[in-house]
């Protein structure tokens, strides 16, 4: 393969408005798959966080004693914060390990299926323990922390692999995966409110609600696995996921060999043979059917000498570029192994810093510090969680419209500007500003800015014209996931320290 430029323009024919920008069912189903993969990343965490009363009183249901008194009030009063801290610590470690050559050699689909399978064990454990009951409250604490740590591992696998898969796709697919993160959170909050309103508050009612609640989670997780399983056969997804494309071409070549043996007169071009392709096939389609030459695929040393923070000054549209390593016979593993994480980091680090700071601020204050506000309302915690999830959801929906997407420089400004929420929250916690109205306003703003600037910072990482290889885009997306986890980890642990010393 030879190429004279780093990118090629792809012809985009506008589709009717009622198709919402999708040109085929295969493209739409690919988008749906990434939404559900995003949902699966936060499935267990969102389910637990959206039912704060169930978690903080889990010792009652685990021991089967409706009159049980907390033996370790320090833990149970801050169960949500302890859960988040345990989850994010292990998730950060696993995500960092995912950058090593050893992990990159494991096929993405294998890692992703493992990550999607683990939540079943977590959800079943949460449900089964109250059904079987245990004698010790310390056992209930152990269950929560085991679920937190195992959940951190599974989330890391799902997050890193989903980011690696979606990185080379056009921007709207990255937005779909990011949107899925908050769709599940809002959905769990709505389900929790419906169940809380429609059912009683007795011991057995709460147990029934929890089984319905977590059963719905299991159903959604099953659908996500189904969507991932059929994604391998999706022709649109094969254009961008080298692992699936290589497998499809191997199958095509095997089928062609069989046909040649039974019908020698047939002379169909083999997969990867571009000699007979019609001239009307666009540049991207042609690149996908070319054979890869090692001398072309290796990233040249000149490409490592890039401007630091180039993402802030990049021009052009990454969606109109053809990545140089999107050829017919390369796999996703090879793309990842040939890209340099250091080179990618150098180009997109301003957005990575924004991602870290946004999620650090969010987890520093939510849910722990917001729950420290003095209130007599039994709905306060549920409303706080719902407002954050709703704001996060709405702002990510806004980003589906290209004109409303902020530039990298605006993302930097927004990241710094949202810090003004913190001093007002401190006034509420200290009782200087009383009531629930201001905390509700602040949590809504926190959710809106978390989704708008956080999601856009993650999108700018892989979808920048400073990256020219699919492997680089996958690594950039993985780095954004690591930045999220670092922000969540440090934010949740600092929040834990604040709540414990309050």
From Swiss-Prot:
Describe what happens upon changing residue 159 to C. No significant effects on inosine uptake
Q: Name one GO molecular function term.
A: nucleoside transmembrane transporter activity
**What's the effect of swapping residue 169 to C?**
No significant effects on inosine uptake
Q: Consequence of mutating residue 142 to C? A: No significant effects on inosine uptake
Q: Where are the transmembrane segments?
A: 31-51, 82-102, 112-132, 138-158, 179-199, 211-231, 353-373, 381-401, 409-429, 437-457, 478-498
Membrane topology is: Multi-pass membrane protein
Keywords, alphabetical:
Cell membrane, Membrane, Transmembrane, Transmembrane helix, Transport
* Chief place where the protein resides: membrane
The residues forming the signal peptide are none
Q: What induces it?
A: Pufine starvation does not affect expression.
Reaction catalyzed:
inosine(in) = inosine(out); guanosine(in) = guanosine(out)
> Which residues fall in a coiled-coil region?
none
State how changing residue 165 to C affects the protein, per the record: No significant effects on inosine uptake
**Mutation effect (residue 155 to A):** Confers adenosine uptake. Reduces inosine uptake. Retains significant cell surface expression. Increases sensitivity to tubercidin. Does not affect sensitivity to formycin B
Consequence the record notes for mutating residue 159 to A/G/N: Confers adenosine transport activity
Variant or mutagenesis effect after changing residue 155 to R: Reduces inosine uptake. Retains significant cell surface expression. Does not affect resistance to tubercidin. Does not affect sensitivity to formycin B
- Cytoplasmic-side stretches of the chain, per the record, are 1-30, 103-111, 159-178, 232-352, 402-408, 458-477
Q: Which SUPFAM superfamilies match?
A: MFS general substrate transporter
Cellular localization per UniProt: Cell membrane
Q: Name one GO cellular component term.
A: plasma membrane
- What family is it from? Belongs to the SLC29A/ENT transporter (TC 2.A.57) family.
**Anything else known:** Can transport formycin B, a toxic inosine analog, but not tubercidin, a toxic adenosine analog.
What is this protein for, i.e. what is its function? High affinity transporter for inosine and guanosine.
Question: What name is this protein filed under?
Answer: Nucleoside transporter 2
């Amino acid at each position: 393969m030879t190429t004279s430029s780093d990118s090629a323009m792809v012809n985009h024919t506008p589709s009717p408005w009622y198709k919402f920008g999708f040109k085929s069912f295969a493209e739409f189903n690919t988008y749906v798959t990434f939404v559900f993969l995003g949902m699966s990343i936060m499935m267990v965490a969102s389910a637990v966080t959206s039912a704060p009363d169930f978690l903080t009183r889990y010792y009652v249901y685990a021991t089967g004693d409706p009159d049980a008194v907390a033996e370790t009030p320090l833990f149970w009063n801050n169960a949500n914060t302890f859960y988040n801290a345990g989850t994010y610590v292990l998730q950060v470690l696993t995500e960092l390990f995912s950058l090593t050559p050893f992990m990159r050699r494991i096929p993405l689909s294998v890692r992703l299926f493992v990550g999607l399978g683990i939540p079943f064990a977590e959800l079943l454990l949460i449900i089964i323990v109250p059904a079987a009951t245990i004698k010790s409250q310390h056992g209930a604490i152990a269950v929560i922390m085991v679920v937190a740590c195992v959940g951190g591992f599974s989330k890391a696998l799902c997050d890193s692999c989903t980011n690696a898969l979606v990185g080379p796709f056009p921007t709207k697919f990255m937005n779909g995966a990011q949107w899925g993160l908050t769709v599940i959170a809002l959905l769990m909050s709505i389900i929790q409110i419906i169940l809380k309103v429609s059912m009683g508050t007795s011991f057995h009612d709460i147990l029934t609600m929890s089984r319905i609640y977590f059963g719905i989670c299991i159903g959604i997780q099953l659908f996500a696995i189904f969507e991932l399983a059929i994604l391998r056969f999706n022709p649109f997804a094969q254009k961008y996921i080298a692992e699936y494309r290589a497998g499809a071409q191997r199958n095509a070549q095997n089928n062609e060999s069989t046909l040649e043996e039974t019908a020698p007169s047939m002379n169909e071009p083999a997969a990867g043979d571009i000699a007979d392709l019609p001239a009307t096939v666009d540049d991207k389609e042609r690149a996908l059917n070319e054979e890869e030459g090692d001398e072309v695929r290796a990233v040249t040393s000149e490409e490592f000498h890039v401007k630091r923070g180039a993402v802030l000054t990049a021009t052009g549209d990454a969606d109109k570029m053809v990545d140089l390593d999107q050829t017919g016979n390369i796999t996703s593993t090879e793309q990842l192994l040939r890209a340099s994480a250091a080179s990618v980091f150098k180009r997109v680090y301003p957005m990575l810093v924004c991602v870290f700071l946004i999620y650090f601020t969010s987890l520093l204050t939510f849910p722990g510090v917001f729950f420290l506000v003095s209130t007599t309302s039994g709905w306060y915690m549920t409303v706080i969680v719902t407002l954050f999830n709703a704001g996060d959801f709405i702002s990510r929906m806004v980003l589906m419209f290209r004109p409303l997407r902020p530039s990298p420089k605006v993302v930097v400004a927004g990241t710094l500007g949202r810090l003004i929420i913190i001093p007002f929250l401190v006034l509420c916690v200290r009782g200087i500003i009383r009531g629930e109205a201001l905390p509700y306003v602040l949590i809504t703003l926190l959710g809106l800015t978390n989704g708008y600037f956080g999601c856009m910072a993650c999108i700018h990482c892989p979808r920048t014209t400073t990256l020219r290889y699919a492997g680089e885009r996958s690594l950039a997306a993985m780095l954004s996931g690591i930045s999220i986890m670092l922000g969540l980890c440090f934010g949740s642990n600092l929040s834990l320290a604040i709540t414990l010393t309050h």
